[in-house]
Amino acid sequence: MKFELKGEHIALCDLLKTVGIAQTGGQGKVFVADGNVTVDGAIELRKTAKIRKGQVVACFGETIEVS
């Protein structure tokens, strides 16, 4: 799926909530902490990692292309 970034960046847990993978920001943080999220192909464990345009986030088989 594609996600159009409105600002300079978005926190990883907020992105997961915004696109509907996580029901809440807290659930998004758990997904990240459990190692279920990759950013540009690498497992990301920082819950509030700043996601910027051009990055690709994947979680539970869903891929998010940030533009």
Please report, for each region that a protein language model flagged, where it lies by residue.
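N-terminal beta-hairpin/loop module of FHA
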Residues: 1-6
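A basic, amphipathic helix-loop patch mediating RNA/tRNA/ribosome contacts
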Residues: 8-50
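Short, Lys/Arg- and Gly-enriched loop/turn segments at beta-strand edges
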Residues: 63-67
